[in-house]
Amino acid sequence: VATVQGLSGTGSLRNLGLYAERQIGMFSFTGLNK
């Protein structure tokens, strides 16, 4: 659901990064996004 909302929003990449970071935990997309 979070991913769908992210794609609908302007910050899709940001939301996907946060979601992926929670799921994976190993990678930090938010750090790369800074």
Curated annotation (Swiss-Prot):
Q: Write the Enzyme Commission number(s) for this entry.
A: 2.6.1.1
As its record notes, the protein acts as a catalyst of: L-aspartate + 2-oxoglutarate = oxaloacetate + L-glutamate
* Keyword terms: Aminotransferase, Pyridoxal phosphate, Transferase
Signal sequence residues = none
One Gene Ontology molecular-function label: L-aspartate:2-oxoglutarate aminotransferase activity
Q: Which residues cross the membrane?
A: none
Task: Say which enzyme class the record assigns.
Answer: transferase
What does the sequence similarity comment in the record state about its family?
Answer: Belongs to the class-I pyridoxal-phosphate-dependent aminotransferase family.
Q: How does it assemble?
A: Homodimer.
> Additional comments on file?
In eukaryotes there are cytoplasmic, mitochondrial and chloroplastic isozymes.
Report the protein's function: Important for the metabolism of amino acids and Krebs-cycle related organic acids. In plants, it is involved in nitrogen metabolism and in aspects of carbon and energy metabolism.
Q: What is this protein called?
A: Aspartate aminotransferase 2
Which species expresses this protein natively?
Pseudotsuga menziesii (Douglas-fir)
Q: What is the lineage of its organism?
A: Eukaryota, Viridiplantae, Streptophyta, Embryophyta, Tracheophyta
